[in-house]
Amino acid sequence: MIALGVNIDHVATVRQARGTTYPSPVEAALVAEVAGADAITLHLREDRRHIQENDVVILRDRLKTRMNLESAVTEEMIAFACRIKPHDICLVPERREELTTEGGLDVIRHFQQVSVACKRLAEAGIRVSLFVDAQAGQIDAAVEAGAPVIELHTGRYADAATPEMQQVELETIRTMAAYAFGRGLQVNAGHGLHYENTVQIAAIPELSELNIGHAIVARALFVGFAEAVREMKALLQQARA
């Protein structure tokens, strides 16, 4: 069965919009676990636009599933992760002006920096994932860097302008998921997935986990957070039925 990682970033986005103490991303994470989430994903950005350090610290001791911490490959963030010791860390690219992560980590270009980070995190007992575009070269670089897991960036698929273009992107993800799996990696995927486009991705047999957040938070406005998680979990189960 494919796992569902629920990203709680945008619960924190609502909180930070007014500088209040609510809604609590910690509470959202605990509700998501009860509703069937297999992991909780959260991105501690350098600009701290949503998730804050204290959210990570509190959740680390309260989660019953797994914490998947997303972070940039910086000394500050790697040191923080080594101190907190999440179950998993997904290294992502980051630009302050972006609305959300816009593409995969260029492991080829930043190979030395990524390799050092992978080694350091692994020595701290943290499983490392690299968020990469669905390209063989990036997958090969991830293997060489020592990452046991990759997360394929599904943004181009999610943002495709036509059904035909989306199908092309889907085939690319299918091909690269199989390629990465064949190279011995655990293969996850995420970015831009929602209730209308997730089943096709979840049906790819080599994928182990999907990380989904914005769509679940948006759906929760109308049906509640627990039900939004349950509905997404049902779609993943449907895809593997």
Swiss-Prot record:
GO terms for cellular component: cytosol. Pfam families: PdxJ. The active site is at residues 43, 70, 191. Pathway: Cofactor biosynthesis; pyridoxine 5'-phosphate biosynthesis; pyridoxine 5'-phosphate from D-erythrose 4-phosphate: step 5/5. Keywords: Cytoplasm, Pyridoxine biosynthesis, Transferase. Its EC number is 2.6.99.2. It is found in: Cytoplasm. The keyword Hydrolase does not apply. One of its GO terms (molecular function) is pyridoxine 5'-phosphate synthase activity. GO terms for biological process: pyridoxine biosynthetic process. It catalyses: 3-amino-2-oxopropyl phosphate + 1-deoxy-D-xylulose 5-phosphate = pyridoxine 5'-phosphate + phosphate + 2 H2O + H(+). InterPro entries: Aldolase_TIM, PyrdxlP_synth_PdxJ, Pyridoxine-5'_phos_synth. 1-deoxy-D-xylulose 5-phosphate binds at residues 9-10, 45, 50, 100. The keyword Cytoplasm applies. The record marks 151 as: Transition state stabilizer. 3-amino-2-oxopropyl phosphate binds at residues 7, 18, 192, 213-214. Catalyzes the complicated ring closure reaction between the two acyclic compounds 1-deoxy-D-xylulose-5-phosphate (DXP) and 3-amino-2-oxopropyl phosphate (1-amino-acetone-3-phosphate or AAP) to form pyridoxine 5'-phosphate (PNP) and inorganic phosphate. Homooctamer; tetramer of dimers. Belongs to the PNP synthase family. This is Pyridoxine 5'-phosphate synthase. The gene is pdxJ.
